[in-house]
Amino acid sequence: MDQLKYPIGTFSKPLEADERELEKWIGDLKQAPHLLRSAAAELNEEQLDTPYRTGGWAVRQVVHHLADSHMNGYIRSKLALTEETPLIRTFDEQNWAGLTDARTLDPDLSLALLDTLHLRWAALXESLTEADFEKAYIYPGTGEEMKLYQALALYVWHSQHHIAHIKAHRKRMGWN
């Protein structure tokens, strides 16, 4: 496994989740924007625009990618709750990260968005029943089913994965 690419390992989709795990994931979801803000704090423009690995995104793009991805994840969750196992739409995250907004805007814009989004998402999850967490959506192309408890675990991992990218990058570059 490439430590630069997967600093906390790859995602392992859980096959079940109990109430304790759900509560932990919801708490982790609430905490993630704060941890991301801390990881990216006090970086100057040059540092924000430095890729965390060869062929990887700049720190700025990582922050904006998390907002883009998690908005999609939140909407997918709402679709699964209101439609019968919907086929969701994917997005080209590489192309999105290459758009001008992801390459140039202040990361604080996406950090503020993530603060609010994660609070909404956590409140939604706190309102769900066990049966709700079993609802799912389908990825086009692969046909993979993602239950809502699995999606919650995925987006918590995704947050931690990119926070670890930024923290490890800062350490390698001596920016701590």
Curated annotation (Swiss-Prot):
Q: Offer one Pfam family short name for this entry.
A: DinB_2
- Protein name per the record: Putative metal-dependent hydrolase BLi00869/BLi00870/BL03027
Give the required cofactors: Zn(2+)
Assembly mode: Homodimer.
Q: Which NCBIfam families match?
A: PRK13291.1
Does this entry carry the keyword Zinc? yes
Q: What class of enzyme is it?
A: hydrolase
Organism of origin: Bacillus licheniformis (strain ATCC 14580 / DSM 13 / JCM 2505 / CCUG 7422 / NBRC 12200 / NCIMB 9375 / NCTC 10341 / NRRL NRS-1264 / Gibson 46)
Where is the protein localized? Cytoplasm
Job of this protein = Possible metal-dependent hydrolase.
